[in-house]
């Protein structure tokens, strides 16, 4: 396990991003985080912009997916690496499901700082997702303020798949 007094040992790190986005990590047992921590990873997480718990203005990401939430996750990663030099920044991973999976896709398409990623139950392309989900087509209008008939360009600009060639 992690021993803060041992400054010589390094650990791989995992940024884990919750679903939602209107959800939140709380100080409770979260199976995936515990499994990775038990395997020797330094697991860290945040409740980025778009999360519940700080009011509607903070939680409303409408039309901004993959922008300020991404910046927030990268700022938290920077701060964690600064506070815990035992984390090997060359052995970073990112993971998440649903919205966390979308953000995992977004992260790996927009930065090369993570060596591994596990995207679960995620959106990678807002256009193809629009009519192939149990959530319904209206989710796109609510979340990114676009649909394939009125503004497919905006949908594509918010799609992690667009940035997959990084």
What are these regions (language model features)?
Residues 45-166:
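Active-site-proximal cap/loop segments of hydrolase catalytic domains
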């Amino acid at each position: 396990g992690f021993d803060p007094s041992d400054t010589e040992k390094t650990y791989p790190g995992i940024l884990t991003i919750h679903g939602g986005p209107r959800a939140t990590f709380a100080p409770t047992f979260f199976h995936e985080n515990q499994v990775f921590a038990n395997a020797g990873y330094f697991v860290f997480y945040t409740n980025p912009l778009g999360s519940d718990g700080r009011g509607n203005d903070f939680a409303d990401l409408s039309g901004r997916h993959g922008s300020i939430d991404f910046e927030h996750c990268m700022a938290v990663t920077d701060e964690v690496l600064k506070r815990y030099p035992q984390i090997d920044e060359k052995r970073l991973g990112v993971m998440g499901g649903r919205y966390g999976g979308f953000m995992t896709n977004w992260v790996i398409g927009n930065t090369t700082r993570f060596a591994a990623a596990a995207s679960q139950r995620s959106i990678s392309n807002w256009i193809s997702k629009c009519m192939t989900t149990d959530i319904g087509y209206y989710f796109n209008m609510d979340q990114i303020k676009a649909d394939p008939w009125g503004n497919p360009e905006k949908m594509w600009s918010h799609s992690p798949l667009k940035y997959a060639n990084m």
